[in-house]
């Protein structure tokens, strides 16, 4: 299955701004045309969203289905495409996180990777722990809305 699963807390960022992407995430991304990740500021949370180039293509198709002169389309294009960066893997599976994305997510010297299916998120570890508590509560409250459609 080609999805991003699991969380990895407290991955260190070195002095050059490099962080190692978890091996199982790299395995999913290895099937992509680009050897790296596409990263952009999350529009939902104070974190970085990342994915492969094929998911960016799906986002492009969804955004292009909107009215070309709508405020919504302009906002999505600006945030997702205008702020996105292609980050190539080095020989050790690391990427360099740009300062602008680190600042958006409040990241300094450690990150937490969180699999979200077709994307993964990169968080400041304490911010993720705080978010996880509220997400667990909401998931518990809304658990009956998740139904099998088969």
UniProtKB/Swiss-Prot annotation:
GO CC term, one of those recorded: nucleoid
Q: What is this protein called?
A: Transcriptional regulator MraZ
Q: Which UniProt keywords apply?
A: Cytoplasm, DNA-binding, Repeat, Transcription, Transcription regulation
SUPFAM superfamilies, A to Z: AbrB/MazE/MraZ-like
The entry assigns this protein to a family as follows:
Belongs to the MraZ family.
**Keyword DNA-binding in annotation:** yes
- A single BP term in Gene Ontology: negative regulation of DNA-templated transcription initiation
Q: Name one GO molecular function term.
A: DNA-binding transcription factor activity
Q: Which CDD domains match?
A: MraZ_C (cd16321), MraZ_N (cd16320)
What PANTHER family has UniProt attached to this entry?
A: TRANSCRIPTIONAL REGULATOR MRAZ
Organism, scientific name: Rickettsia bellii (strain OSU 85-389)
Subunit and partners: Forms oligomers.
Q: Which gene encodes it?
A: mraZ
Which cell locations does it reside in? Cytoplasm, Nucleoid
Q: Name all SpoVT-AbrB domain ranges.
A: 8-55, 84-127
């Amino acid at each position: 299955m080609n999805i991003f699963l699991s969380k990895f807390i407290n991955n260190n960022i070195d002095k050059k701004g490099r962080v190692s992407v978890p091996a199982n995430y790299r395995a999913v991304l290895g099937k992509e045309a680009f050897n790296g990740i596409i990263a952009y500021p999350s529009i939902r949370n104070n974190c970085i969203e990342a994915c492969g180039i094929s998911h960016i293509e799906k986002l492009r198709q969804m955004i292009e289905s909107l009215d070309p002169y709508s405020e919504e389309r302009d906002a999505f294009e600006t945030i997702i495409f205008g702020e996105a960066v292609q980050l190539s893997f080095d020989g050790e599976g690391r990427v360099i996180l740009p300062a602008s994305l680190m600042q958006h997510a409040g990241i300094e010297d450690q990150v937490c990777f969180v699999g979200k299916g077709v994307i993964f998120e990169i968080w400041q570890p304490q911010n993720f722990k705080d978010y996880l508590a509220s997400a667990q509560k909401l998931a518990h409250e809304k658990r009956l809305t998740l139904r099998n459609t088969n």
